[in-house]
Amino acid sequence: TGIEWTPIGSTVNEDGEVEHCFSGKFYGNGYTISNLDFSENYGKTEYPSFGFFSEVHGAEISGLTIQGNLDVSNSEYVFFGTVAGVAVDSKISDCVSNVSFTDTDKYINGTVALCGYAINSTIEYCQNKGNFSVMKDTSQFWMGGIVGLAENSTVQYCVNTGDMTSWTPSSGGIVGFLTKSSKVINCYSTGKIVPLGKGTTDFGGIAGTVGAGTEIRHCYFAGEMDLSQYTATPPYKRLGGIAGGVSSDTPVFENNYFVKTENVPACFKYQDAGTEKTLDFMKTEDFFNEITAAGGNYRFNSNGTPILPAPKYSVSFVVTPAELTNVIIKVGGQVATNPADLEAGTYQVEVSADNCEVFNSNITITADTATHTHTIAMTYLPADYTKVDTAIGKVNALNKDEYKDFTKVEEAVNAVVRGKNITEQTEVEAMAKAIEDAIAALEYKDADYSKVDAAIAKAEALNKNEYKDFT
C-alpha cells in the first residue's frame, strides 16, 4: 500500500467552496514523488478537487513526476488530476504522471487526468504513463491522459502512453473534453484504447469531445484500438482516431494522423479531421517527414513513431542602455534571436554593441520563468584622454614662476574629470582644449633689469675723460 495523500491547496469552507489554493511556484527539479495512494481521500466532500495539488490559481508547476495509484471507493463528484485537480490561470510543464486509476463498480462523476480541469491554463511538455479504467457507465465524467476538461486552455507538446478503458461520456488520449477555444497542439498518444458500451459515449485517440472554437493541430494517435468489448454498430459515430464526438460545428483540425482501425474514422462528423495510416508506416522516416513538413515539431525516432522535441523556453534578453545600436547576442557561440528558444541548460552568452565593451557571462535556463528573462547592462568603452594627457604633460614642463598668472592653467587641469565613457568624448575634448587655451594665454613676467640699472649707474658715475678709451 502507498502513503495516504492530503492534497496541497485544499481548504474548503462550509459551503464547499475552496478558500485557499496554491498560487505559487513549484519546481520539482526532476524529482519523483512515489508511492502515493489517492484512494482513501478520493470522493470525500472536503476534497471536491483532488490530486497532488487540489486547486492551483496563477501557479507554475514543473519538473515533477507523480507515481501512485487510486482505487475508487467513493461516488462523489471529484475533479481529479494526478498533478492538479483544477488549474486556473496556471502553467504546468515538464511533469510526468504514472498513477493508475481504477473504478470497477462505483458511479462516479468528474475527471481523471494529469490535470483534471484546466481553465485559462497551459499544459506543455507533460506525459501520462498511468492506465485509467472506468468500467461503469457515468453521466458526467471526462477522462484524458493530460487534461480531463479543458476550457480556454492550451495543451501542447504532450504525450500519453497509458492505456484507457472507458465507459465515460468523454474520453481522449490527450484531452477528455475540449471546449471554449481550447487547443491541442503537437501532441500524440500511443496508449491502448478500450471503449465500452453501445456507442453512446465519445472516445477519441486525441480528444473525446471537441467544442466551439477548439483546435487540434499536428497531432497523431498511434495506439491500439481494442473493440472486443464495444457493442456499437458500425459505422462508429462516436469513436474516432482523432476525436470521438463534436458538440459544436466550429472545431479546426490540421495535419493530424491516426492508426488504421476497421470502421473507425478520424471523426465521424469531420472525416478529414485526420489522415489514416498503418502503424508500420507511422514508424518510418517518411511519416516523420510528412507530419513535420506540414508544421509538426517532432524528432525522428528510429525505434518507433516520432517523439516530441526537448522542452524549449522563450528566453528574452533586455540589453541596456536601450539606445544602443548594432546589438548582437550570441548564445553558445551562435548569433541568437531575441527572444531565443532554448532548452534547459547552461549557456555562454556574448553581447556586443557599438561603443561598448563585449559582455560575457553564463546563464542557466530551467522551467522557472524567472530564468526566462535576463537583463544585460552593457559598459561603454572609456573615453580617449590622449589629448588631455598631452596637454597636462605640457603644463608639467612649464615653470609657473616664469609667468604673470598661472591660475587659469591650474584651474583647467584641476577641472579634468576622469572616468568618462566614449559617449562623453566631446566633454573630454573640451577639457583638453581648456588646458591648451590656458597655456596659450600665459604671459611671461617682465625681465629683471636691476643689475643692468646698477651697472649703468656705475658707468654714469665715472669721468670718462680719466680713461684712455671710454668707447
Where are these regions (language model features)?
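Surface-exposed repetitive/solenoidal architectures
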Residues: 1-314
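A short, compositionally biased
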Residues: 18-22, 322-325, 344
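Short, isolated positions in well-ordered beta-strands
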Residues: 19, 33, 336-337, 358
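Contiguous beta-strand segments of beta-sheet-rich domains
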Residues: 64, 347-349, 431
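Beta-rich interaction/scaffold domains
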Residues: 313-324, 352-372, 377-471
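Short, ordered, surface-exposed loop/turn motifs in non-cytosolic proteins
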Residues: 322-337
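Short Pro-Gly-centered beta-turn/loop motif in secreted/extracellular proteins
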Residues: 334-354
